[in-house]
């Protein structure tokens, strides 16, 4: 599906969203999660379908999971605006895999990066809870990426507030995702990723009460010559560095852009 940008229409965006829903239903049989560092870059007319998965080993005191899965669809509706639809599934220990959230929102590119330098964006997402007696949530925060030659540093800082009658906290949750990456060539790269989560900023507690993990990740990028079709893959091992976190998390990402 590699149409010239000038021929892409809102109808095609709707078709892609429908495709994402179909994939989300099928994904109920796989093992996936959302440990992924997002880029601030926005490209008008580009459609991206992403799958972010994880499998957990050695349950933590506050995290007792088997697997989780996130499917994300993005569409560049303007030079700096991006429309986002997401779905999230999770399987806890002793439970079955369940659809947990449906999410919709957007991203605005504040500072556009050209080659080396800084890129900056802001993302906002409304997360609809799909399970009874769980609160809806609003996620918002900045994304930044700095590039110098083959090296780059990316950080996402997201705040999450609960809304609705089933709120469990009145404060905000904080999630910080970061990545240091070195590209060896146009296809291969290695990096280190880290993920931190404080579930209630008004009662942050000790380090071991929070969820923190980091580890090495390998990246592969493929581009179809003569077309706009791009594939990106990543696989890594994240080690829990707090008592609340699972000992080991195997993460994998797959993304197609056109």
Question: Language-model segments: which ranges?
Answer:
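Bacterial N-terminal signal peptides
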Residues: 15-27
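Transmembrane beta-barrel domains of Gram-negative outer membranes and organellar outer membranes
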Residues: 31-258
């Amino acid at each position: 599906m590699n149409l010239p940008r000038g021929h892409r229409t809102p109808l095609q965006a709707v078709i892609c969203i429908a495709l994402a829903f179909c994939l989300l239903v099928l994904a109920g049989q796989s093992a996936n999660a959302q440990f992924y560092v997002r880029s601030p870059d926005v490209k008008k007319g580009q459609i991206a379908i992403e799958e972010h998965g994880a499998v957990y080993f050695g349950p933590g005191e506050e995290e007792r999971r088997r697997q989780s899965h996130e499917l994300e669809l993005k569409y560049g509706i303007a030079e700096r605006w991006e429309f986002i639809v997401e779905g999230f599934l999770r399987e806890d220990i002793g439970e079955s895999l369940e659809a947990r959230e449906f999410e919709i929102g957007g991203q605005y590119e504040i500072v556009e990066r050209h080659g080396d330098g800084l890129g900056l964006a802001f993302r906002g997402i409304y997360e609809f809870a799909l399970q009874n007696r769980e609160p809806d949530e609003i996620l918002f925060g900045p994304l930044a990426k700095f590039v110098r030659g083959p090296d780059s540093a990316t950080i996402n800082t997201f705040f999450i507030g609960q809304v609705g009658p089933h709120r469990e906290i009145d404060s905000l949750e904080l999630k910080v995702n970061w990545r240091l990456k070195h590209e060896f060539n146009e296809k291969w790269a290695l990096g280190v990723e880290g993920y931190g989560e404080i579930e209630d900023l008004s009662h942050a507690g000790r380090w071991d009460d929070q969820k923190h993990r980091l580890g090495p990740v390998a990246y592969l990028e493929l581009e179809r010559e003569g077309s706009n079709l791009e594939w990106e893959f990543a696989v890594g091992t994240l080690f829990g560095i707090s008592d609340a976190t699972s000992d080991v998390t195997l993460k994998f990402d797959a993304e197609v852009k056109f």
